[in-house]
UniProtKB/Swiss-Prot annotation:
Cellular compartments per GO CC: cytoplasm
Gene giving rise to this polypeptide: coaD
Residue(s) at site: Transition state stabilizer: 18
Similarity comment: Belongs to the bacterial CoaD family.
Organism field: Pseudoalteromonas translucida (strain TAC 125)
Classification lineage: Bacteria, Pseudomonadati, Pseudomonadota, Gammaproteobacteria, Alteromonadales
Reported function: Reversibly transfers an adenylyl group from ATP to 4'-phosphopantetheine, yielding dephospho-CoA (dPCoA) and pyrophosphate.
UniProt-recorded name of the protein: Phosphopantetheine adenylyltransferase
Binding locations of ATP: 10-11, 18, 89-91, 99, 124-130
Pfam family, one: CTP_transf_like
This protein's UniProt keywords: ATP-binding, Coenzyme A biosynthesis, Cytoplasm, Magnesium, Nucleotide-binding, Nucleotidyltransferase, Transferase
Length: 164
């Protein structure tokens, strides 16, 4: 039986923490769908199309990873793509409470969907897209936290000029 997993998120922008989890998940599952969310309650820095394009560029070397944009319920997306695993990253204990509630809701909406929680590597445990954008907005060095392609896109989008 082939197992398809979905790794959902806003990915605004995709960080080294995200790509680490995607690479690790790609070794665990036959197919990993990186599902980039359009969330009307958030004001992303990058448009959905820009986030999908960045992710496609960064993940093209991983054969069993597919990048899509989506809106709507994750449980429905999983059903539409015959995915039975939902990958979620947990950076700290504080993330677990929300993720636990989300896993239970998704299982209620789609009983065939199981959540798998992955912890980041130690070097990525504190990285978040929000922090990366905040540092970049102040011309800080984010090269340790994102791919050079993302750093260039952030510099262009935010009008920053940091370079190493």
């Amino acid at each position: 039986m082939k197992i398809t997993a979905i790794y959902p998120g806003t990915f605004d922008p995709l960080t080294n923490g995200h790509t680490d989890l995607i690479q690790r998940a790609s070794k665990m599952f036959d197919t990993v769908i990186v599902a980039i969310a359009h969330n009307p309650s958030k004001q992303p820095c990058f448009s959905l199309d820009e986030r999908v394009a960045l992710a496609n560029t960064l993940l093209t070397h991983i054969d069993n990873v597919k990048v899509i944009g989506f809106s709507g319920l994750l449980a429905d997306l999983a059903r539409d793509h015959n995915a039975n695993v939902l990958i979620r990253g947990i950076r700290a204990v504080s993330d677990f409470d929300y993720e636990f509630q989300l896993a239970n809701m998704n299982r209620r909406l789609n009983p065939d969907l199981e959540s798998v929680f992955l912890t980041p590597s130690e070097r990525n445990s504190f990285i978040s897209s929000t922090l990366v954008k905040e540092v970049a907005r102040h011309n800080g060095d984010v090269s340790e936290f994102v791919d050079p392609i993302v750093m260039a896109a952030l510099n262009k989008k935010l009008g920053c000029s940091y370079s190493k």
